């Protein structure tokens, strides 16, 4: 089976794309292969069996994906998230469509031969502070309005909670993922006690001393600290935005309920329409 076209994104796009510690860590083929093996109960040993797939211009189009790669006849889209996003099935549909377009480029879709495609698998690794079950599923059909019967188009995304203490069996089979969860837990714990910069530095120092992601942190310490600070700031701002949106929605709902009550009472009391409008 032919492999998907792989291209390297332009340098400007890389600068604009905000990296994460998760993506930095698993961009290494050996580590990514260990995660894939743990996820699928496989025993691949040669990292070259895994091919990283990068879509040219995907970042510019707002369709970035943390880790897109192929193993055998599968194409896997892995993404790390620290906030819940129910729109991931739609995002993944857009992204995988670009992958398939790249694969069948210059091939006729009107011939009598079936064009074979890599089997897709979509996974989100969640480690936010909101409560989430160890394994949940998002479906594209959840977004359909007035769906009747089975959907003609479906896309399922598995969401795994990889916070420390969750999905222990998976962690046992992927030491790198387990240590990543330990690092994140330390950052969060110390952030509650001290300034963010100091919390990240302490977490990194402690992990190195305890042999947690030791080589990775020694080799990438400055970048990991910077990215961790940016990640936490981003999470904090998104949390504040969600809280503000919730409060605005609650206030709007209260105002709507009050107005609805005025109209209903006025109509019941046969109050003239101009007088009802004046009360609103």
Model-predicted regions and their roles:
Residues 1-280:
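Elongated, amphipathic alpha-helical interaction scaffolds
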């Amino acid at each position: 089976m032919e492999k998907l076209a792989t291209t390297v994104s332009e340098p400007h796009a890389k600068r604009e794309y905000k990296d994460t510690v998760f993506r930095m860590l698993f961009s290494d083929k050996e580590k990514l292969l260990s995660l894939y093996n743990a996820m699928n109960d496989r025993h691949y040993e040669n990292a070259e069996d895994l091919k990283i797939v990068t879509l040219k211009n995907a970042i510019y189009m707002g369709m970035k994906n943390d880790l897109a790669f192929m193993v055998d006849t599968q194409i896997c889209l892995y993404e790390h998230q620290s906030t819940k996003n129910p729109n991931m099935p739609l995002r993944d549909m857009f992204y995988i469509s670009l992958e398939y377009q790249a694969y069948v480029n210059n091939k006729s879709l009107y011939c009598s031969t079936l064009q074979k495609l890599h089997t897709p698998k979509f996974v989100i690794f969640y480690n936010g502070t909101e409560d989430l079950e160890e394994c949940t599923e998002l479906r594209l059909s959840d977004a359909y309005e007035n769906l009747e019967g089975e959907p003609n188009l479906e896309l399922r995304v598995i969401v795994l909670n990889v916070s420390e203490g969750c999905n222990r069996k998976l962690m046992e089979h992927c030491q790198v993922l387990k240590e990543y969860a330990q690092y994140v837990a330390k950052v969060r714990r110390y952030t509650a006690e001290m300034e963010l910069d100091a919390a990240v530095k302490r977490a990194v120092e402690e992990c190195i001393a305890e042999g947690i992601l030791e080589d990775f942190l020694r080799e990438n310490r400055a970048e990991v600290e910077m990215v961790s600070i940016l990640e936490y700031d981003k999470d904090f701002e998104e949390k504040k935005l969600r809280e503000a949106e919730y409060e605005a929605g609650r206030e709007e709902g209260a105002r709507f309920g009050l107005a609805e009550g005025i109209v209903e009472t006025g109509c019941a009391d046969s109050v003239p329409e101009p007088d009802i409008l004046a009360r609103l």
